[in-house]
Amino acid sequence: MYDDGPRKGKPGGLSMDAATAAGLAAVWPEYFPEESEFAADGRSARLAADLVDLFSSPDASDLLSRVEDDGDILSLPVDFQQLSNLTWITEALQENPKEALLSMGAAVHLIVCASRDLQLGDINKINIRLYNHTKTIALKNLKAAYIKKLVTVRGTVLKVSTVKPLVLQLNFQCMKCATKFPRVFCDGKFSPPVSCSIQGCKSRTFIPMRSTAKLMDFQKIRIQELASGESHEEGRVPRTIECELTEDLVDCCIPGETVTVTGIVKVLNNYMDVGGGKSKSRNQGLYYLYLEAISVRNSKVHAASGNSDAASGSFGFQAFTEKDLEFISKFKEEHGADVFRQILHSFCPSIYGHELVKAGITLALFGGVQKHSIDQNKVPVRGDIHAVVVGDPGLGKSQLLQAAAAVSPRGIYVCGNTTTNAGLTVAVVKDSMSNDYAFEAGAMVLADRGICCIDEFDKMSAEHQALLEAMEQQCVSVAKAGLVASLSARTSVLAAANPVGGHYDRAKTVNENLKMSAALLSRFDLVFILLDKPDELLDKRVSDHIIALHSNDGGPFTANKRIRTVPQFNASTEFGVGRTSLASRLRLHPEKDKDFCPLPGPLLRKYISYARSHVNPRISMPSPAADSLQKFYLDLRKQSDSADGTPITARQLESLVRLAEARARVDLREEVTLEDAKEVIDIMTESLYDKCVDEHGVVDFARSGGMSNQKQSKKFLRALNEQCDLQKKDCFSMNEMYNLADRISLQVANLDAIVESLNNAGYITKKGSSMYQVVTSSYQGSQATWSRR
């Protein structure tokens, strides 16, 4: 504590030289307006004198050179760690942080004016912005014991108000004797004088002299605790706290950003100083906490100052201790080229199989590299990977998403059937106290630089259009209540959906199974389809896995080791023959990997955060990896070449590059290798196969969008009926049918199969080697209509 005793090591003992005292007396009203006069023997004055001596030393010249000039507002960023060895300063900051910071500002004011040959009145008040202050405190621990203390909290900006002027000081004039009274408003709380202090005048009426008002910029923000923190508690509403920003701190953050706020904890009672009646007796003893911000640090400030970690897409001030860095180094050295398999099986080990699906989600967690994110002259290219898992109920899709949100350094999990459009993107809310409109961030904005997991994706068809911009342009534009803005939403989207009707129908396209537009589906880099196929061998091994998961005898033979004894099934039972290379390499062997132990969640989160923050792989041109990706893309274009257009576009090539960069990030490499490209091609092939295969097992790239064969058959039969009425005949040759299919742009790979299916259904009848009669034509007077499905 800063007491009345002499300072140890302080030059000059208790005395204060006349020059310092005169200088402090001149600037004192600027920093302590509530004090009527400068007291040289006061605690704050002696602290300021000590700080003048400290900052006058040559070691402090570098610190004072950092004074920032933002118009008429001056500020000095001070690293707390540089002052931590000075006990008397840390004790003063702990006992009365407001007084200590103001005294420090007054001392810096004197030194800056002396070093720049300026008069004390030539510059305005200097604000001390203390950062890097001790360990952050969780919002749940912020209670009454911290009132008037200096603390540091971290969270996501949930809401930002408009900037308004706050009155700090105002003169009032008595209506009776015309005497003027200066009035200082502590903490901005407006409190006019009660009665005139002049002898003999008892007037209670005063006129505010608005021209004498001393103002400063004021803004409120609300921050929410980080959902993926290790101290996060499930089953409760995330805690929030309001922070007051003043002067140079206003407009330093936007909704969705992760910020570290250092400030003083204060209390406020909404019913204080309010006239009688019910409001005076209601909740009179209840207060709520808020922060008076001293400094705000966020990724935008770091990126603007040239910090490469922020520019590379870090997860917002993830701290790495020496033990963390040592673990990452040893983990990479121990597993070598097997890191990907180790991380993949550490992710959601309770789900059996689905290695390639887990591989795709793992790559989405690491993400690619965003290009041109800072250069204003170039269009940014997203590096986040989007994936959707479609399949029958009960295959573990929701567990995969919850596991992804849990291990992500910044992950948000939402359910589609309880999510609104505004809750997913951004809402405009009205402040009850100021009647102003402000933005309130939704899930996509809160997950900025992270991952957003959306379950029950098929239940939110009305909100699909809101995701189109957020998934490709990585931002959310809003124009509501007279507010027009664009908020960052640089997030990976992981979605899980059940098909319409509860069971995936191979005869329908992915769009028809999900009721999803082709524009939204094309934005997903990976589309995985999980089918519940009856398989005696697979069912036996899945049941063994589930029983092993639930049977823990309490001995060293834990459930985790018991799971390893379950033999992994052959890929041909799930994925088909001929596509087993990557899946077989990723699969755990029951004998070789019997001692496998998954990586704990906190360590996996640290590894992912480090990779995303410090590893920025690139793909060189020319290189074997680039040539391999380009060749695969060109082969896809050739295979999907058709007259009605193709779903294989440049987006697939960009997806391949993003996946290859993510694969290199897993191994902490700065260069994409040929092996990375091969593994990514295997994953992309699996995704395309699932998306484009039909009910007969035939791969048709046009089936990723558009209509299924059933709807194409309906369209073709309708055209045949129209031709019967126009040409007054009901028999057509195959050549005429081919010409008709071309005219109506029928999107089928095999017209003969369509004709054969219509013949088998009885809608057309074969009359010769290549002649067919239309049975449902109105030309024959038939009243039959197309009613079959």
Curated annotation (Swiss-Prot):
BP-aspect Gene Ontology terms: DNA recombination; DNA repair; DNA replication; meiotic cell cycle
One GO cellular component, as annotated: nucleus
Positions annotated as zinc finger (C4-type): 174-201
Residue interval(s) of motif Arginine finger: 522-525
Single GO MF annotation: ATP binding
Binding site for ATP: 391-398
Reactions listed under catalytic activity: ATP + H2O = ADP + phosphate + H(+)
EC number assigned by the record: 3.6.4.12
Major subcellular site: nucleus
Keyword ATP-binding set for record: yes
Subcellular location: Nucleus
Domain MCM as annotated: residue spans: 339-546
Residue ranges crossing the lipid bilayer per the database entry: none
Keyword Cell division: no
Keywords for the protein's UniProt record, in alphabetical order: ATP-binding, DNA damage, DNA repair, DNA-binding, Helicase, Hydrolase, Meiosis, Metal-binding, Nucleotide-binding, Nucleus, Zinc, Zinc-finger
Family matches, as Pfam families: MCM, MCM_lid, MCM_OB, WHD_MCM8
Family: Belongs to the MCM family.
Record function comment: Probable DNA helicase that may play a role in DNA repair during meiosis.
Protein name according to UniProt: Probable DNA helicase MCM8
Organism field: Oryza sativa subsp. japonica (Rice)
